[in-house]
């Protein structure tokens, strides 16, 4: 192998040790599965009664227990423009059409579809049991929301320790495009909690604040 040229080396490595297989094998071998990890993770991230039925379901990652899904990220569906809430299912089983309770908002909403991401492609499923990282549509909540069937002690809220450090004014060339701009900025703020969107009341400018020049340029 030492005598191979650079391109031949790359080809050999790809054929004999494809990166995606190596990484997935390492994750499977070295990362604890949800049934093992939740026994020591739950006491650190959930402040409820561990001896309650709900607490026991969380500790054992019980697919037949009370539902507990925590939103960790909001993704905007490019086709429908609607929210897709990604997160982890700690207990219970998700099914389309289920009416759920958003503990932080104090609202009942209904799940429409269930997804598991295969790479960047979402796959529709009929049910998803506890222990999976998945996504749901039809529910409008924020990152950190705890979704259950009835009011329960929620998981600890997410804390964003970084504050925006740079602000830029966003303008449109045509006044008729202003509603589109406002909608795009709203979606950006939904997907990235570190972005702050506001309107300057004196000038009427739409202001977008982020973590730096590169952060705003990427968006």
Language model features with spans:
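Structural and coupling elements of P-loop NTPases
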Residues: 1-219
